[in-house]
């Protein structure tokens, strides 16, 4: 696909004279365009749901969720991956973000990195990619060689693959087993795909990782019951989670959390089933870590 023919490289009539308007009008133009992004994502919800189900199946069998991207796309993958351990208590290696150019590229532009097919393959080899893993290639244009080569290598290994782009019929979409293509149209600043396309990618990644965690028992109701208390705010959140899940008061919630080394799931089962910490943990283990299953009458 030629660059000049891509939707993400098109000219947006709504912003054709954005350099001549007031600051407030400038903001309105950008905001009006941003409003279209959730609607574009809504149109591909079935594709996102299909990807979540596959990711959950693979991760449940011992696989990992691997994000692969360049520039903004790579940074968004790293951002999503880095939030999973503190939010859901998973090991840091379960969700992995890879960016063309390596760690230096997180904060700096690395010339030519996205054009390196070898880089995409080598980065996956370096993390010991296996057929059980899922590789999600992220590229707004859908033409990034680093991502395409990585997806091709992953498929050769037998991995399930997902391609996220914002141009229909892109190479990323055709290379991946599952294509997620929110078409957000031309950017306010021509070709600046960190804007609407980046926002769409962020929304999709939010759904992929959150959907995986919900289906893995990391959420009870809408509570993040595997949150790790790494600061005072999260200590308070843990107490509120136990309170909201059980109806107990703050003192009871804190006492239960202390007794079970601050594991919200265990504390919730302790309170609701009147068990001690060891009994509650055993009950959870017997039910795969799912609170609802642990609470069912035996």
Swiss-Prot record:
Reactions that this protein is recorded to catalyse: N-acetyl-D-muramate 6-phosphate + H2O = N-acetyl-D-glucosamine 6-phosphate + (R)-lactate
Q: In which pathway does it act?
A: Amino-sugar metabolism; 1,6-anhydro-N-acetylmuramate degradation; Amino-sugar metabolism; N-acetylmuramate degradation; Cell wall biogenesis; peptidoglycan recycling
GO terms (molecular function) for this protein are: carbohydrate derivative binding; carbon-oxygen lyase activity; ether hydrolase activity
Sequence intervals crossing the membrane: none
Instruction: Report the EC code(s) recorded for this entry.
Output: 4.2.1.126
Active site: which residues? 83, 114
CDD domains from the xrefs? SIS_Etherase
Q: Domain named SIS: which ranges?
A: 55-218
The chain's coiled-coil residues are: none
Enzyme class at the top of the EC tree: lyase
The UniProt keyword set, sorted, is: Carbohydrate metabolism, Lyase
What do we know about what induces or represses this protein's expression? Induced by MurNAc 6-phosphate that releases the repressor MurR from the DNA. Repressed by MurR in the absence of MurNAc 6-phosphate.
| Highest rank taxon of the organism | Bacteria
Further remark? A lyase-type mechanism (elimination/hydration) is suggested for the cleavage of the lactyl ether bond of MurNAc 6-phosphate, with the formation of an alpha,beta-unsaturated aldehyde intermediate with (E)-stereochemistry, followed by the syn addition of water to give product.
Classification via HAMAP family: MurQ (MF_00068)
Please name the PANTHER family in this protein's record. GLUCOKINASE REGULATORY PROTEIN (PTHR10088:SF4)
Q: Which family does it belong to?
A: Belongs to the GCKR-like family. MurNAc-6-P etherase subfamily.
The UniProt subunit note reads as follows: Homodimer.
Functional note: Specifically catalyzes the cleavage of the D-lactyl ether substituent of MurNAc 6-phosphate, producing GlcNAc 6-phosphate and D-lactate. Together with AnmK, is also required for the utilization of anhydro-N-acetylmuramic acid (anhMurNAc) either imported from the medium or derived from its own cell wall murein, and thus plays a role in cell wall recycling.
User: What is this protein called in UniProt?
Assistant: N-acetylmuramic acid 6-phosphate etherase
């Amino acid at each position: 696909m030629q660059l000049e023919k891509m939707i993400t490289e098109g000219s947006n009539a709504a912003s054709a004279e954005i350099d001549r308007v007031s600051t407030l009008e400038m903001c309105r133009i950008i905001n009006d365009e941003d409003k279209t992004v959730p609607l574009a994502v809504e149109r591909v919800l079935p594709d996102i749901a299909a990807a979540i189900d596959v990711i959950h199946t693979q991760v449940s069998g011992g696989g990992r969720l691997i994000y692969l991207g360049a520039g903004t796309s790579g940074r968004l993958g790293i951002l999503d991956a880095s939030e999973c351990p503190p939010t859901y208590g998973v090991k840091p290696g379960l969700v992995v973000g890879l960016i063309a150019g390596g760690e230096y590229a997180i904060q700096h532009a690395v010339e030519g990195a996205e054009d390196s097919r070898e880089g995409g393959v080598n980065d996956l080899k370096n993390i010991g990619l296996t057929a059980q893993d899922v590789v999600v290639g992220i590229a707004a244009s859908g033409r990034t060689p680093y991502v395409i080569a990585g997806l091709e290598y992953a498929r050769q290994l037998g991995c399930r693959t997902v391609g996220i782009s914002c141009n229909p019929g892109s190479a990323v979409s055709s290379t991946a087993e599952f294509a997620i293509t929110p078409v957000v149209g031309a950017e306010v600043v021509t070709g600046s795909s960190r804007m609407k396309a980046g926002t769409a990618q962020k929304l999709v990644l939010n759904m992929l990782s959150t959907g995986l965690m919900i289906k893995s028992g990391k959420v009870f109701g809408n509570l993040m019951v595997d949150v790790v208390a790494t600061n005072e705010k999260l200590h308070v959140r843990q107490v509120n989670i136990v309170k909201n899940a059980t109806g107990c008061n703050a003192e009871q919630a804190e006492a239960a959390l202390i007794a079970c080394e601050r594991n919200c799931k265990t504390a919730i089962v302790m309170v609701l089933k009147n068990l001690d910490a060891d009994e509650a943990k055993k009950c959870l283990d017997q039910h795969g870590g799912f609170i609802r299953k642990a609470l069912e009458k035996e």
